[in-house]
């Protein structure tokens, strides 16, 4: 088994973990309705890139 040679300091541990943070989902505003939705996903009322592509919850 691999065993560390020397103990890592809290500072080095923090430096290693500095890139582990998760970012939130990218959001867009639908130009037709002004509704917020995830990028590259159909908005809840059925619009995608300014066009009605499916029945939404309003219909």
Curated annotation (Swiss-Prot):
InterPro entries recorded: Ribosomal_bL32, Ribosomal_bL32_bact, Ribosomal_zn-bd
UniProt GO BP: translation
Bias-annotated ranges (Basic residues): 49-59
Keyword Ribosomal protein belongs to the record: yes
UniProt KW Ribosomal protein keyword: yes
One Pfam assignment: Ribosomal_L32p
Alphabetical UniProt keywords: Ribonucleoprotein, Ribosomal protein
Region (Disordered): 1-59
GO cellular component, as recorded: large ribosomal subunit
Molecular-function GO terms, alphabetical: structural constituent of ribosome
Family to which this protein belongs: Belongs to the bacterial ribosomal protein bL32 family.
Name used for this protein in its record: Large ribosomal subunit protein bL32
Organism: Alkalilimnicola ehrlichii (strain ATCC BAA-1101 / DSM 17681 / MLHE-1)
């Amino acid at each position: 088994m691999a065993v560390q040679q020397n103990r890592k300091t809290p500072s080095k541990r923090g430096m290693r973990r500095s890139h582990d943070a998760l970012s939130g989902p990218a959001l867009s505003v639908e130009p037709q309705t002004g509704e917020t939705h995830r990028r590259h996903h159909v908005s809840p009322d059925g619009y995608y890139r300014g066009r009605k592509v499916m029945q939404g919850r309003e219909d």
